[in-house]
Regions:
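Phosphate/dinucleotide-binding and metal-coordinating scaffold of catalytic cores
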Residues: 1-183
Length: 183
């Protein structure tokens, strides 16, 4: 068996290497913060109590990369976008971990990225949504068919059309707005 450890920022492999700079201190892209302490550049999602009984606020960064992920989640009807499924890469990218709890024909959107609820979708993102709609009318649906059902493709198409006709981020379902646990 061969195993390779993936070096992390700040790791030092031997005495000759200089450690990487420490990452900036501050909240993660999605985080729990003490109630009333939402820093600039972050959007509150909900108020809750932590395991110690203290009030906390679930927040996420007001970041264009996360906003695009939130739109993607709306389109694919992601039922499981947890905070731990959003990774900040050392390359500056933001990556979503998805495992197939999406593309359902019934509305099942559950995400921690509700900070933009009720806000308009930006024009650049709408152009991409229109591109997806057009691709689904072309050959892209044939690429998807071996992997998802016709009904799921039809639902995806309907969500693209719906977002283009009403380019506003949806509001959460009051019954089950976020996946649990949130991280």
């Amino acid at each position: 068996m061969v195993q390779r450890w993936v070096d992390q920022p700040g790791d030092v492999l031997d005495d000759t290497e200089v450690p990487d700079e420490e990452p900036d201190a501050g909240p993660d892209l999605v985080d729990l913060l003490p109630a009333g302490h939402v820093p600039p550049g972050f959007l509150p999602v909900l108020q809750a109590y932590d395991y110690a009984g203290d009030e906390v606020t679930l927040v996420h960064a007001d970041d264009a990369r996360l906003r695009r992920m939130a739109v993607f989640d709306v389109l694919i009807n992601n039922a499981d976008r947890k905070g731990g499924h959003i990774l900040a890469g050392v390359d500056g990218g933001v990556y979503g971990v998805d495992h197939g709890v999406s593309l359902h024909t019934e509305d099942k959107l559950r995400t921690v990225l509700w900070g933009w609820a009720g806000k308009p979708v930006d024009d650049d993102t709408l152009r991409d949504v229109a591109g997806l709609r057009d691709a689904l009318l072309g050959d892209f649906d044939q690429t998807l068919r071996p992997h998802v059902t016709n009904r799921e493709i039809d639902a995806l198409y309907a969500r693209t059309v719906g977002l283009l006709e009403n380019p506003v981020m949806p509001s959460p379902d009051r019954r089950r707005p976020i996946p649990w646990p949130a991280f």
